[in-house]
């Protein structure tokens, strides 16, 4: 208080002018007090140049327009209280200023645009004056002898200012980043709205098409089905039926098909395991079925064998379950007292095979072959397939395999086409039904006829003698 009164008495209106010229800097990061109007000097200083002992900035500093360095006080307590000037009670431009600094200046930002600086001074007073346009800074010091410049404290303060500015810049960048994130979120939401299109409702019963596959039967449409047995692609039911007819495929997956060890996977192992379980389940079911345990009557088999033996034919029948046994449709007609045979015809030169059922034993071989190789009476479709036999001028030869021969020894009987089937089957062994091989005469084949073998053996004996 006394210090303020003495200053008021010495300076007169100068102190009032200083108070009016002092205002807070509105720029963030600048904590100094600016003096826009020059203050009268204390102790002989000129008006407008500030107090005595003030350092003026040279021309080089003004030209470079660098920010003036602030000189902190080392462990000084500065107090400044301005009281009892006319019309004002510590109020400067509508703002309260109470400056208190202990140990080092502290700056507190309470509101944006409002800065309260508290400084308490006991022996010396430092006032920093700066102009925005001219960058002029004036320092007023009561006792310049007590002011010491310490580089360490100055560097610390500069670092604190730099850190504070960095923090503010980071906050500003943080707000920008948040705004960018919000903008990106909005864009993502818009994209999701665009992507959320109504699902396509496929018609009922529409199956997924096999990618990049064509029907292997017609070759025009895209494949929709794949046969589990032969893995052939098909597009429709007619193509499925056609491929089954052409390849004699039943469409059922072959559980016992061969798979190499390189292609064997866990799915194949699981399939084999389930197959064995099915076999065990079927065997257990059969063992528990009382009806299946009954012995099958063999009266019909014995009757067929006895009738064939009476006619001089050695007929052999296979047990139930064999394929040839299932295919056999031979029966004995009691009214006519003759056999109606199941006959298989094979044409090796055309790779064709046909079956004749209910063939009476009094029918000749030529009559049996007439619907196949006769140029006039044969079926047109069969004639087209057996055109090699129809166009042949050498004629055909009818052979039948000899049963119960030694291993890897295959021989054939040559049948007489002008004799009946019964005459050709006498004194021969027949397993289930006769199979006739129709070959072209003079064709090079590995079929050796029994008559040729006998003639060759007799020739060899004559040459030795």
Swiss-Prot record:
Ranges of compositional bias, category Basic and acidic residues: 56-70
Gene Ontology CC, one term: nucleus
Zinc finger feature spans (HIT-type): 215-249
Residue sites binding Zn(2+) 2 per the record: 227, 230, 243, 249
Region spans: Disordered: 1-72
Residues where Zn(2+) 1 binds: 215, 218, 235, 239
Keyword Transmembrane: no
Alphabetized UniProt keyword annotations: Isopeptide bond, Metal-binding, Phosphoprotein, Ribosome biogenesis, Ubl conjugation, Zinc, Zinc-finger
GO biological process terms, semicolon-separated: box C/D snoRNP assembly; maturation of LSU-rRNA from tricistronic rRNA transcript (SSU-rRNA, 5.8S rRNA, LSU-rRNA); snoRNA localization
Pfam families recorded: zf-HIT
PROSITE patterns: ZF_HIT
Chain positions of cross-link Glycyl lysine isopeptide (Lys-Gly) (interchain with G-Cter in SUMO2): 79, 108, 118, 138, 148, 157, 168, 178, 195, 454
Sites bearing Phosphoserine, chain numbering: 25
InterPro entries found in the cross-reference section: BCD1, Znf_HIT
CDD domains: zf-HIT_BCD1 (cd23023)
An example Gene Ontology molecular-function term: zinc ion binding
Entry function: Required for box C/D snoRNAs accumulation involved in snoRNA processing, snoRNA transport to the nucleolus and ribosome biogenesis.
Record note on quaternary structure: Interacts with FBL, SNU13, NOP58, NUFIP1, RUVBL1, RUVBL2 and TAF9. Interacts (via HIT-type zinc finger) with the RUVBL1/RUVBL2 complex in the presence of ADP.
Family of the protein in this entry: Belongs to the BCD1 family.
Name this protein carries in UniProt: Box C/D snoRNA protein 1
């Amino acid at each position: 208080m006394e210090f303020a009164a003495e200053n008021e008495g010495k300076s007169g209106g100068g102190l009032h002018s200083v108070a009016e010229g002092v205002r807070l800097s509105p720029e963030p990061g600048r904590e100094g007090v600016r003096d826009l109007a020059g203050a009268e000097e204390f102790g002989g200083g000129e008006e407008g140049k500030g107090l005595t002992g003030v350092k003026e900035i040279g021309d080089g500093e003004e030209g470079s327009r660098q920010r003036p360095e602030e000189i902190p006080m080392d462990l000084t307590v500065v107090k400044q209280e301005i009281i009892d000037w006319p019309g004002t009670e510590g109020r400067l431009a509508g703002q309260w200023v109470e400056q208190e600094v202990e140990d080092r200046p502290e700056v507190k930002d309470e509101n944006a645009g409002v800065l309260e600086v508290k400084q308490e001074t006991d022996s010396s007073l430092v006032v920093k004056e700066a102009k925005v346009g001219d960058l002029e800074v004036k320092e007023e010091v009561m006792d310049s002898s007590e002011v010491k410049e310490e580089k360490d404290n100055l560097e610390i303060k500069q670092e604190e200012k730099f850190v504070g500015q960095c923090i503010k810049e980071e906050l500003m960048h943080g707000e920008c980043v948040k705004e960018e994130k919000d903008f990106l979120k909005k864009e993502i939401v818009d994209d999701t709205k665009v992507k959320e299109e109504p699902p396509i409702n496929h018609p009922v019963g529409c199956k997924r098409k096999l990618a990049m596959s064509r029907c292997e039967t017609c070759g025009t449409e895209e494949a929709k089905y794949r046969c589990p047995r032969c893995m052939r692609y098909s597009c429709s039911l007619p193509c499925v039926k056609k491929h089954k007819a052409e390849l004699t495929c039943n469409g059922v997956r072959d559980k016992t098909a061969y798979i190499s060890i390189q292609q064997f996977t866990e799915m194949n192992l699981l399939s084999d395991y389930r197959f064995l379980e099915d076999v065990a389940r079927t065997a257990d079911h059969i063992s528990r079925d009382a009806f299946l345990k009954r012995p099958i009557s063999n009266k019909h088999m014995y009757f067929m064998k006895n009738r064939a033996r009476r006619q001089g034919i050695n007929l052999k029948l296979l047990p139930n379950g064999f394929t040839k046994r299932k295919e056999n449709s031979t029966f004995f007609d009691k009214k006519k007292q003759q056999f109606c045979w199941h006959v298989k015809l094979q044409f090796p030169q055309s790779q064709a095979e046909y079956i004749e059922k209910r063939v009476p034993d009094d029918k000749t071989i030529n009559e049996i072959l007439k619907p196949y190789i006769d140029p006039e009476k044969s079926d047109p479709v069969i004639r087209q397939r057996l055109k090699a036999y129809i166009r042949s001028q050498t004629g055909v030869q009818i052979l039948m395999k000899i049963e119960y021969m030694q291993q890897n020894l295959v021989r054939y009987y040559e049948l007489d086409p002008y004799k009946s089937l019964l005459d050709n089957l006498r004194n021969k062994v027949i397993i289930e039904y006769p199979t006739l091989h129709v070959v072209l005469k003079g064709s090079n084949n590995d079929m050796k006829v029994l008559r040729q073998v006998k003639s060759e053996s007799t020739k060899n004996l004559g040459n030795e003698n």
